[in-house]
Amino acid sequence: MSDENNSGAAAPEAQNPGQNAAQPAVRLQILTQYIRDLSFENAVAQKGLPSGEVQPEISVQVSLDARKRPAEHQYEVISKFRVQSSNATDKSPLFLCELDYGGIFHVEGVPEDQLHPFLMIECPRMMFPFVRRIVSDMTRDGGFPPFNMDPVDFVALYRQEIARRTQAQRPADQPLS
């Protein structure tokens, strides 16, 4: 029976035993996650129910920040979400939800030139399901249907931020290439 499942090919580790030895294994551990700042404003409750039909229009803005902590191999990553809903017909505000969600990560084995993208892409990606649940619960608890955010493309967000920083460093009279 064991001969039927064995095709005779060696396992990838056995074929190239020294290939992975030069590159250390990446070690990532979430030490803690927490709400750093949280705000929910229900404009409907403050102004009263809008007249006519309400067609909600929702915008989501995301920004990220990462910094080294005093402890070795520890980094703090902050994801900032601003979720704003307004009535599509008259642009009147419905709610505003702001959440700064943080995580402290222990990261080892990531090459220095890849550490910043790793912190700004992989760490927020790991925290996102928790952010999504908090925003969903907040909108529901605020008197609205739960808002389940679509997944965020953190790679595209990182590339946009790098492009923005590059553009900001370029002198105004220098042409774009």
Swiss-Prot record:
Location of the protein in the cell: Cytoplasm
UniProt entry keywords in alphabetical sequence: Chaperone, Cytoplasm, Protein transport, Translocation, Transport
Annotated InterPro entries: SecB, SecB-like_sf
Top-rank lineage group of the source organism: Bacteria
Keyword Chaperone belongs to the record: yes
Compositionally biased intervals (Low complexity): 8-22
Location of the region described as Disordered in the Swiss-Prot/TrEMBL record: 1-22
Biological processes annotated in GO: protein folding; protein tetramerization; protein transport
GO cellular component terms attached to this protein's record: cytoplasm
UniProt entry tagged with the keyword Transport: yes
Molecular function GO terms recorded: unfolded protein binding
Family statement drawn from the similarity comment of this UniProt entry: Belongs to the SecB family.
HAMAP family per record: SecB (MF_00821)
Description of how the protein assembles with itself and partners: Homotetramer, a dimer of dimers. One homotetramer interacts with 1 SecA dimer.
Function: One of the proteins required for the normal export of preproteins out of the cell cytoplasm. It is a molecular chaperone that binds to a subset of precursor proteins, maintaining them in a translocation-competent state. It also specifically binds to its receptor SecA.
Protein name: Protein-export protein SecB
Source organism per UniProt: Paracoccus denitrificans (strain Pd 1222)
